[in-house]
From Swiss-Prot:
<keyword id="KW-1003">Cell membrane</keyword>
<feature type="compositionally biased region" description="Basic residues">
    <location>
        <begin position="854"/>
        <end position="863"/>
    </location>
</feature>
<feature type="compositionally biased region" description="Low complexity">
    <location>
        <begin position="837"/>
        <end position="853"/>
    </location>
</feature>
<keyword id="KW-0597">Phosphoprotein</keyword>
<feature type="compositionally biased region" description="Basic and acidic residues">
    <location>
        <begin position="338"/>
        <end position="352"/>
    </location>
</feature>
<keyword id="KW-0443">Lipid metabolism</keyword>
<feature type="compositionally biased region" description="Basic and acidic residues">
    <location>
        <begin position="466"/>
        <end position="475"/>
    </location>
</feature>
<comment type="function">
    <text>Macrophage receptor that binds to the apolipoprotein B48 (APOB) of dietary triglyceride (TG)-rich lipoproteins (TRL) or to a like domain of APOB in hypertriglyceridemic very low density lipoprotein (HTG-VLDL). Binds and internalizes TRL when out of the context of the macrophage. May provide essential lipids to reticuloendothelial cells. Could also be involved in foam cell formation with elevated TRL and remnant lipoprotein (RLP). Mediates the rapid high-affinity uptake of chylomicrons (CM), HTG-VLDL, and trypsinized (tryp) VLDL devoid of APOE in vitro in macrophages.</text>
</comment>
<keyword id="KW-0445">Lipid transport</keyword>
<feature type="compositionally biased region" description="Basic and acidic residues">
    <location>
        <begin position="312"/>
        <end position="330"/>
    </location>
</feature>
<dbReference type="InterPro" id="IPR026158">
    <property type="entry name" value="ApolipoprotB_rcpt"/>
</dbReference>
<dbReference type="GO" id="GO:0030229">
    <property type="term" value="F:very-low-density lipoprotein particle receptor activity"/>
</dbReference>
<keyword id="KW-0449">Lipoprotein</keyword>
<dbReference type="GO" id="GO:0034362">
    <property type="term" value="C:low-density lipoprotein particle"/>
</dbReference>
<feature type="compositionally biased region" description="Basic and acidic residues">
    <location>
        <begin position="672"/>
        <end position="687"/>
    </location>
</feature>
<keyword id="KW-0753">Steroid metabolism</keyword>
<feature type="compositionally biased region" description="Basic and acidic residues">
    <location>
        <begin position="240"/>
        <end position="252"/>
    </location>
</feature>
């Protein structure tokens, strides 16, 4: 190569470039990093200097292979020293070749610089000696950097200066050896220079480890010698060489640029920096790594070489440090880019290491504090959380911290509370609950205001005791039937904070809900004792006692407003809790057994699955079935009302007060989102029912009837889905207009006002179902669907039948309810087959709902609805006309007729219905032929 360089520079350059490209490619294949072309390397190649440097580098690589073991072995022989140095050279060379990928620009630059310096030296001195010298010089540039860095690594790894001393000795010996071998002043000088640089690096690390001023002086002298030697030709070499060096070496490069003391000072400063980093090296591998990688440009293959050699030497010297160094080595490529910030990063790493150590110890408390802060941000739960945290910390600082950390993680991921330490978390939450009950947020206060203060206080006290007693508190909670509801209240309160605090508190709430579920299950026996009390009024009383459902009827009434206020505190919980409240109310309304309600409440949070909800609904169904039919209808009404109230914006709010509802809401949040489509259908159903309030006129009871039937029937899952969908919609942020807004968003046909009106009307209807037919009238009036109580009563008498009819409008639940009301549905499905009479298709909302539900039904048919005629597609005017002869439908038609007259002329809706006909036939049902005939009888819609 030297001959080529001297005789055929062009060919030499070409070969050099090819070799560089090949080496870069090999490095890339090796996977170090993506090689980048180094301008300096190219320039050096152009100069042809690289050739010898690389030849020497290859030789040094060979030496390095033998010396890498020697490096780890130590300072035993000048040969080893020389190998160490050559190993550094070879490491740099090798890494110039291999580490090119990671340090390619640096490696090649150093290679180029080393070769350039070496060949400059060669050009200045005999080429033959200069080859060795170039080798020492070139590798003195590269290998010295590499060796220094390697030695620095080794020394930093050793953090004891042993590798430093070894490398220093090796370097010193190698200086002698090099001098002897080269016999050239340049060789000697370059070797000492090279030694001085590795020595400087070693000295740097020695400074780091041993802080030997001797090393610094020696390295400085070597640096000076090198600087002097390379004053003209070595400057480039040292610049390239030292720039690859790190900050200290960069300083040397600067010193080289500013030869003399400055370079020494820079080297010493760099060494001092290295010393500091080495001091911290064992502690701060990242700092060392950063120091190792001074710059992308400063770093050179030697960095990788250092890493590798360092690993080998550390294997021999300090495996532990080797591991740390390896970690640092892993960091090197990254930190190499940060090399310029090495000093700052070193300090930053030191501070970070210290901070990390402190943070590790303080992390749990910080997490708790974060939660506390989040809770405090919640405002409502601020004092509660503070007190709860204080009490919980006082009583279980250690475990509270762990659960808090767990909860933070969980809260972030919103995993089940089960993920966190149940016992300690339960205790923590119990304490928080107890304090939450004591500090009862407005939700709890509302419930307390509802006359539950004594029990709330009692529950709060019991919860506090539980907090104090830990799991015993849980047992006590389970022992107290009201505690589970109360704890739910606490959870409700806490969910309020959760709503504000966000996922963390939600995780806490979820976890505590799981606890509540267990407690409620335990309370189940106690609640069973109160089953008999589950009479419709007593169920309400039980709710009041439980602090959960006392507000349900009230929720429908003024209690709902209070709960709304409480819920306002928990906006996040509004949607989730709203849906939960719907389900919860269903549960608790069906709560002939409070335990079942609690269980089901807990079940939903436990499983957070529609399955859970379905299961809970099934349990509710069982409870409903177990309870008297009157209670069942009442509970069903309330359930429906709760569900629909959840659908409506009020529902989520007043139900947000229900902690189990929060559980359900969270459980459903996951599913509710997935079941958004169902929710939309539910919305359609709700809106349809709202628009179809004729069917719903008495159908608060009808709703209760078919909802009960749904629950009793196989529709439990559907209802759960409906509730889930309602949840999803609430979660969607449709503030109770969820159904309407969802339908509106989905269809865009219904105006938000109409949707809201429908939702509110339906809510009113539901509330009226709970409160009486007068509410139905209100609903109908509000909807503009003027339905007389007689009609309502007629429909009430026909509830079962009309429920299917109404259910038919409901894509999910109403149809399912129809299916759920087997006898009624089957007996009346012919009449209800075409709910046109019940559905005021003339009302745009009804038509929108019909079209919407029909299209959705087509998109995803529900076999549960098969038994139910497709009211949504059925609504064409012919259907109402054809079916109005049916007596029930006649009465319904009478009811609708006023609505039609109020809203539109009877004839007007027909074209609109015809427009809706384009939707399709919908699901197969027994009345398909009738529907088809009715449609055929009608003129084609324009």
């Amino acid at each position: 190569m030297d001959f080529l360089r001297l005789r055929l520079p062009g060919l030499h350059q070409a070969l050099r470039g090819a070799l560089d490209s090949f080496s870069a490619f090999v490095s890339y294949l090796v996977g170090d990093t993506v090689p980048t072309v180094e301008r300096q390397t190219q320039a050096a190649e152009e100069l042809g200097e690289v050739t010898e440097g690389k030849v020497v580098g290859e030789e040094a690589q060979e030496v390095l292979e033998g010396l890498r073991s020697g490096q780890s072995e130590g300072v035993e022989a000048p040969e080893e020293t020389r190998r160490c140095q050559e190993g550094s050279l070879a490491g740099e060379q090798t890494w110039g070749w291999r580490a090119d990928s990671s340090a390619r620009p640096q490696a090649e630059r150093q290679d180029t610089g080393s070769w350039k310096a070496a060949e400059d030296a060669r050009g200045q001195e005999p080429s033959v000696p200069l080859k060795p010298e170039a080798e020492p010089g070139t590798h003195r540039d590269r290998s010295s950097n590499t060796a220094q860095e390697i030695w620095e690594h080794g020394e930093e790894e050793a953090s004891s200066g042993e590798p430093l001393r070894t490398c220093e000795q090796k370097e010193e010996e190698e200086e002698v050896v090099r001098a002897a071998e080269s016999g050239m002043a340049e060789g000697v000088e370059s070797q000492p220079t090279w030694h001085s640089e590795p020595g400087g690096n070693a000295g740097t690390e020695g400074q780091h480890v041993t802080e030997d001023s001797k090393e610094i002086d020696w390295v400085a002298k070597d640096m000076v010698a090198e600087i002097e030697w390379f004053g003209a030709k070595g400057i480039d070499k040292e610049e390239e060489r030292m720039v690859p060096m790190r900050d200290g070496e960069r300083a040397r490069a600067q010193g080289t640029q500013c030869p003399g003391a400055e370079s020494e000072d820079q080297a010493m400063l760099s060494r001092e920096a290295w010393t500091v980093s080495d001091r911290e090296g064992a502690d701060s591998l990242g700092v060392q790594g950063t120091e190792y990688g001074s710059d992308p440009g400063d770093n050179f293959p030697g960095t990788t070489g250092r890493v590798w050699v360092l690993e080998e030497a550390d294997k021999g010297d300090q495996q532990d440090e080797v591991d740390e160094k390896r970690e640092a080595e892993v960091r090197f490529p990254i930190q190499t880019l940060e090399a310029e910030r090495t000093g700052e990063m070193t300090e930053g790493h030191i501070a970070e290491e210290e901070a990390m150590g402190e943070q590790e110890t303080e992390g749990s408390f910080e997490d708790e504090e974060r939660q506390d802060l989040a809770i405090r941000d919640n405002g409502v739960s601020l004092e509660e959380e503070v007190r709860a945290e204080e009490s919980s910390r006082e009583k279980r600082n250690s475990w509270a911290t762990e659960p808090t950390l767990v909860l933070d993680t969980e809260a972030k991921d919103e995993p089940d509370w089960e993920d966190s330490p149940e016992v300690s978390t339960e205790e923590l939450f119990v304490g928080e609950r107890s304090e939450a009950a004591q500090m009862t947020p407005e939700v709890l206060r509302v419930k307390v205001t509802e006359g539950q203060d004594p029990e709330l206080v009692r529950h709060s006290q019991a919860l506090t005791k539980q907090l104090e007693e830990g799991q015993k508190g849980q047992e006590e909670t389970s022992g107290a039937p009201d505690l589970s509801p109360e704890r739910v209240l606490s959870l409700k309160e806490y969910p309020g904070p959760v709503g504000f605090a966000g996922p963390e508190l939600e995780a806490w709430g979820n976890w505590s809900r799981g606890v509540d579920r267990r407690n409620s299950q335990e309370v189940k026996a106690d609640a069973e004792a109160g089953k008999e009390q589950t009479a419709t009024e007593q169920a309400v009383e039980i709710r009041a006692e439980g602090g959960q459902e006392a507000q349900q009827p009230e929720v429908f009434g003024s209690g709902g407003e209070e709960a709304l206020t409480s819920v306002a505190l928990n906006p996040e919980l509004e949607g989730s809790q709203g849906a939960e409240a719907g389900t919860e109310e269903s549960v608790e309304e069906s709560k002939p057994t409070e335990n079942e309600a609690a269980e089901e409440e807990a079940v939903v949070p436990w499983e957070a699955d529609g399955t859970c909800r379905k299961r809970r609904l099934e349990e509710v169904t069982l409870s409903l079935q177990d309870s008297e039919d009157t209670e069942t209808s009442y509970l069903a009404e309330e359930i429906i009302v709760g569900i629909r109230a959840v659908d409506t914006e009020e529902g989520p709010k007043w139900e947000a007060g229900l902690a189990p509802e929060t559980e359900l809401g969270k459980a459903w949040c996951s599913e509710g989102r997935g079941e958004a489509g169902r929710g939309t259908e539910l919305e359609e159903t709700t809106e349809k029912q709202s628009g179809q309030e004729v069917g719903l006129v008495g159908s608060a009871e009808k709703v209760s009837g078919y909802d009960i039937q749904e629950i009793d029937g196989t529709e439990e899952g559907e209802q759960a889905e409906m509730e889930t969908s309602v949840m999803a919609e609430d979660i969607r942020g449709t503030d109770g207009v969820t159904l309407g807004s969802q339908a509106e968003r989905a269809e865009g046909s219904i105006t938000p006002m109409e949707t809201e009106g429908l939702l509110r009307d339906q809510m009113l209807l539901e509330e009226e179902a709970g409160g009486g037919q007068s509410r139905e009238q209100k609903v109908h009036n509000s909807e503009g669907e003027i339905q007389t109580l007689d009609d309502s009563s007629d429909q009430e008498g026909q509830q079962t039948h009309q429920i299917p009819t109404v259910a038919v409008p409901g894509p999910l639940e109403s149809a399912e309810a129809t299916a759920g009301a087997p006898g009624d549905v089957h007996s009346n499905w012919n009449e209800a087959l075409l709910p046109g009479s019940r559905l005021d298709v003339s009302v745009p909302r009804s038509r929108v709902l019909l079209s919407r539900s029909s299209s959705r039904r087509r998109s995803r048919p529900s076999f549960h609805r098969i038994s139910v005629p497709e009211p949504q597609c059925d609504p064409p005017s012919p259907q109402p006309q054809a079916e109005r002869p049916v007596p029930e439908q006649s009465s319904l038609q009478l009811e609708e007729t006023p609505e039609l007259s109020a809203t539109k002329p009877e004839g007007t809706p027909v074209p609109a219905r015809r427009k809706m006909l384009g939707r399709g036939f919908g699901f197969a049902h027994p009345g398909m032929m009738q529907e088809l005939q009715a449609r055929l009888s009608q003129p084609k819609p324009q």
